[in-house]
Amino acid sequence: MKRDKVQTLHGEIHIPGDKSISHRSVMFGALAAGTTTVKNFLPGADCLSTIDCFRKMGVHIEQSSSDVVIHGKGIDALKEPESLLDVGNSGTTIRLMLGILAGRPFYSAVAGDESIAKRPMKRVTEPLKKMGAKIDGRAGGEFTPLSVSGASLKGIDYVSPVASAQIKSAVLLAGLQAEGTTTVTEPHKSRDHTERMLSAFGVKLSEDQTSVSIAGGQKLTAADIFVPGDISSAAFFLAAGAMVPNSRIVLKNVGLNPTRTGIIDVLQNMGAKLEIKPSADSGAEPYGDLIIETSSLKAVEIGGDIIPRLIDEIPIIALLATQAEGTTVIKDAAELKVKETNRIDTVVSELRKLGAEIEPTADGMKVYGKQTLKGGAAVSSHGDHRIGMMLGIASCITEEPIEIEHTDAIHVSYPTFFEHLNKLSKKS
C-alpha cells in the first residue's frame, strides 16, 4: 500500500472497541449462566477467533458487527470440541483459554498461526501444571500445538516473574475451577480487565497493590457489557495529532482504565496538548473523550512500572520520539521481544528505513530527535498489526511517499484504521 504525507489531520472518530475487553466479554459470557449482551465489541480477527473457539465448545453466540449476544449455560455446560481450537493470531485467546480448559473434564487441542507457534506458552502452562493441569505440546508444552486433558485443580500461590495480564488471567480462570484459593502476585500491577469484568459477572476477588486472590467454585452470572474504545488503537491517532502540523483530533469514548493509560502519561510528559473529558456514566471500565492538538514535543525516559501500562504502545511512542527534541530512552521493555514480532527489532529496522536515528538496546531502544523522516522506502508490518499502524502514521510525516507491505495484519485489532486515517486527512 502506497501512502504519502498529509498536510493536516482534523475531525472526530469513534475508536473501535477495546480488544482485551472484547475477548473477555465473550469468554466470561460463555462461562456465565444467562444471556450476556455486549455493545461496541471489536469485530477484528483476534476477537472473532475467541467467538469461534467457544462456539466449538457448544456455546450459542450471535454476532452482528459490534453487537454480540452470548447465551451462556455456565462453565459446566462447555462441551468437548470435535475439532482443533484455532486461535488465529491471538495470544490473548490461547493464554486465557488455557486457564479455562485446564479444569474442564474433556480433551482439547489448541493451535494458531505461524506467529502464535513462535510465542512462549510455558509462562502460562507452567503455573497451570502446578495446579494439576495436564497440558502437553512441542518442547514440553512451550509451543503450540498444545493438548489439554481435563484435570481436577488445586489452588496455588503463584509469583509471576513478569507483569503479564495474560498469565494472571489464565491462573485466575483456572483458580475459579480449583479447590481452595488461588493467589497471583506480580512484580508490577498488569492490566486489570479480568478482575473488573469477573466482578461485573458476580465473582468475588480480593486484591492489593500487586496481588489478586480468587476462591474456587464461584459461578458467573450473565451481565451487559459496554466495551469502551481501545486506548492502544487510539494511541496511533493521539501520536498523529501531536505530530502532524495544524491538527486537532477528537477521539470518542476511549477506555481510560488506569492500568492502560501509560500513553497518556508519556504524551503529557512530552508536552503534548491533550485534553481528557471523562464520561460520567462509566460502568466497570472508565472511559471518556480525548482531544489532541499539534504540539512541540520533548524527549523522555520511559522505564520501570509504567512499562506494563504501555507495552503495546511502544512502537508508536518510538515514532513520536523521532519528532521530540532530545534523546528518548525506552528501557525495561524486554517483553517486546515476545510480541507478534520481536518489536525491538521490527521498530528499529522499519524506522531506520524511513531515515530515523534509532538504536536497539537489550531491553528497549534509544531514539534521537528531532528528525526529518525522509521516507521514499518500502517498509513492512512483518505481519504485526501494531508495526503496520505505526508505519501508517509515519507516512503522514515522511518527506516522500512510502510503500507499506503486509497491511492486512492491521485487521487483527483495527479493521477500519486506514478508513479513519483517510477521513481525518480528508482523503477519500
From Swiss-Prot:
Binding positions for 3-phosphoshikimate per the UniProt entry: K19, S20, R24, S164, Q166, D312, K339
Biological processes, Gene Ontology terms: amino acid biosynthetic process; aromatic amino acid family biosynthetic process; chorismate biosynthetic process
EC number, as in UniProt: 2.5.1.19
One protein family per Pfam: EPSP_synthase
Compartments, record wording: Cytoplasm
Catalytic residues, chain numbering: D312
Binding site for phosphoenolpyruvate: K19, G91, R119, Q166, R343, R386
GO molecular function: 3-phosphoshikimate 1-carboxyvinyltransferase activity
Catalytic activity as recorded in UniProt: 3-phosphoshikimate + phosphoenolpyruvate = 5-O-(1-carboxyvinyl)-3-phosphoshikimate + phosphate
Role according to the record: Catalyzes the transfer of the enolpyruvyl moiety of phosphoenolpyruvate (PEP) to the 5-hydroxyl of shikimate-3-phosphate (S3P) to produce enolpyruvyl shikimate-3-phosphate and inorganic phosphate.
Subunit organization: Monomer.
Protein name: 3-phosphoshikimate 1-carboxyvinyltransferase
Lineage: Bacteria, Bacillati, Bacillota, Bacilli, Bacillales
